[in-house]
């Protein structure tokens, strides 16, 4: 099943949100309208701001005073969409006599933003999770009473986010400053996954506007490990990545007596116990297993400790095991002679899970790294990457793509696997740090440069690699793993021209592929 990825687009003749702001939001008769409220759909003259604020304050007092004792709905006057805030507030103050009972936690469901959604669309209220006004419960199918319809907070939130990002791209920082404050207020009132992801995007925009960037030296590697462990436990994305890569490795070494794996990102080594146990059960006895783990120099002691723990496991399950830890600041600094490969006597595998996209931050580095991989002549290369295009030149395009992508990720955390709230929060922080890097930084500091499977296919092909079909068995077993891990109905495994993808609802989020040297290079 091959997915057709379709980007959200805006007709060329349609003015941008920032242009609407700068032109008074569209038109004659709206002169002197407050531009920051206008982008959110409210028509308020600058001269009326004080009067509107007073009316809204009075309305809030009336609602607060009446909520404890009222049980009826509004009278028979219809209150229309409150785009005219002044008239709406006055009408409410005049006609509001009673206040319906309300469960303050009442919310409706919010779909994740998908590629087919127009971010500014106002269609279909049924699937948006928004915290509704106190009058919400007065709406029934048979009721003839008047109701008040509040504009969807979620739609306004996305509009404000995109408008702010566009203002940033146009370097209109005064407008961006005002909009990012509005985004923060809207995000605070938005329930569920959308409110959470918007809060991280608002912080990232604010950091970009005010040029407040976290120092790379200030990031504690041990804290990063904790976040990644929680992400691994909380959702199936890393489990899927490790499982599909391991399955490809097992199929490539069925008759090998010596297996050597070079892991370009050892991290906590969570991938390798499962592979070692599978090798131990291989018919005819396990092969000798060599693991070369690459990590950051700041974690040199942790790498050696991990090697010791894996050696203990290997001894317990009867697998001959050797470990070699390598440290480097940049993967592009690796050289072929560092790996001590033995081409004649071993099957060599190079493994990369979410490690290639950061290399794109340095021009020419990915080409050098892939040339090094090619030089060691691996029998197999496994690659798992995020299925997203976050490495384009245009900031607004990257922002829109990231908003869609992380909305789906946050939604899967909210509605997918049932997990403790603390683990979910840590996973959200893990993803939030990616959002901050993607939106707030530029140049070599921006390492979250995710690319799609189609883009990686071009890069791997240019570097001299041919694709390896992961096969129907890997598809079936990955689907089974997903079911056994309690992944929820929203997750699904998709096959894409021999590669596998893990999707939430209809949006692929993770892509796993396997590669071998082109035929002319395998001699």
Swiss-Prot record:
One of its GO terms (cellular component) is nucleus. A motif (LEXLE motif) lies at residues 56-60. GO terms for biological process: gibberellic acid mediated signaling pathway; response to gibberellin. A motif (LXXLL motif) lies at residues 356-360. Disruption phenotype: Rga, gai, rgl1, rgl2 and rgl3 pentuple mutant displays constitutive GA responses even in the absence of GA treatment. The keyword Repressor applies. Expressed at very low level. Mainly expressed in germinating seeds and flowers and siliques. Not expressed in other tissues. Residues 1-28 are annotated as: Disordered. GO terms for molecular function: DNA-binding transcription factor activity. Residues 440-516 are annotated as: SAW. This is DELLA protein RGL3.
């Amino acid at each position: 099943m091959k997915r057709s990825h379709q980007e959200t687009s805006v007709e060329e003749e349609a003015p941008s949100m920032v242009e609407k702001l700068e032109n008074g939001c569209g038109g004659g008769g709206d002169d002197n309208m407050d531009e920051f409220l206008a982008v959110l759909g409210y028509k308020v003259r600058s001269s009326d701001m004080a009067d509107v604020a007073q009316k809204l304050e009075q309305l809030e007092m009336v609602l607060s005073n009446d909520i404890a004792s009222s049980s009826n709905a509004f009278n028979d006057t219809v209150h229309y969409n409150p785009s005219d805030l002044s008239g709406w507030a006055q009408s409410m103050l005049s006609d509001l006599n009673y206040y319906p009972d309300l469960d303050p936690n009442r919310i409706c469901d919010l779909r994740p933003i998908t590629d087919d959604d127009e971010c500014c669309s106002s269609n279909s209220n049924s699937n948006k999770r928004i915290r509704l006004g106190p009058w919400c419960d007065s709406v029934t199918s048979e009721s003839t009473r008047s109701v008040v319809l509040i504009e969807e907070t979620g739609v306004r939130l996305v509009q404000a986010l995109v408008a702010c990002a566009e203002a940033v791209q146009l370097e209109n920082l005064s407008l961006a400053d005002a909009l990012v404050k509005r985004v923060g207020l809207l995000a605070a009132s938005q329930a569920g996954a959308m409110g959470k992801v918007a809060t991280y995007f608002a912080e990232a925009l604010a950091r970009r506007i005010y040029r407040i960037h976290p120092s790379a030296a200030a990031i504690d590697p041990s804290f990063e490990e904790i976040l990644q462990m929680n992400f691994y436990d909380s959702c199936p994305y890393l489990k899927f990545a490790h499982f599909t890569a391991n399955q490809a490795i097992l199929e490539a070494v069925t008759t090998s007596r010596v297996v050597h794996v070079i892991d370009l990102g050892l991290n906590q080594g969570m991938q390798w116990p499962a592979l070692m146990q599978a090798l131990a059960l291989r018919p005819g006895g396990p092969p000798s297993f060599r693991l070369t783990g690459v990590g950051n120099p700041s974690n040199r002691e942790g790498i050696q400790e991990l090697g010791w723990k894996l050696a203990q496991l290997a001894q317990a399950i009867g697998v001959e095991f050797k470990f070699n830890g390598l440290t480097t600041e940049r993967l592009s600094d690796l050289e072929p002679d560092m790996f001590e490969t033995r081409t004649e006597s071993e099957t060599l595998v190079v493994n990369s899970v979410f490690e290639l996209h950061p290399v794109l931050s340095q021009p020419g580095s990915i080409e050098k790294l892939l040339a090094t991989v090619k030089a060691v002549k691996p029998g197999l290369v496994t690659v798992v990457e995020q299925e997203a295009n976050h490495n384009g030149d245009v900031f607004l395009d990257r922002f829109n793509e990231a908003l869609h992508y992380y909305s789906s990720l946050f939604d899967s955390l909210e509605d997918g696997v049932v997990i403790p709230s603390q683990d979910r929060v840590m996973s959200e922080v893990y993803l939030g740090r990616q959002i901050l890097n993607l939106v707030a930084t530029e140049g070599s500091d921006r390492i979250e440069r995710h690319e799609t499977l189609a883009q990686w296919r071009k890069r791997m092909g240019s570097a001299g690699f041919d694709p390896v079909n992961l096969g129907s068995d890997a598809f079936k077993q990955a689907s089974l793993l997903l079911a056994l891990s309690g992944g929820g109905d929203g997750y699904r495994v998709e096959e894409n021209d021999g590669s596998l993808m893990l999707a939430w609802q209809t949006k692929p989020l993770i892509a796993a592929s396997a590669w071998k040297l082109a035929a002319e290079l395998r001699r």
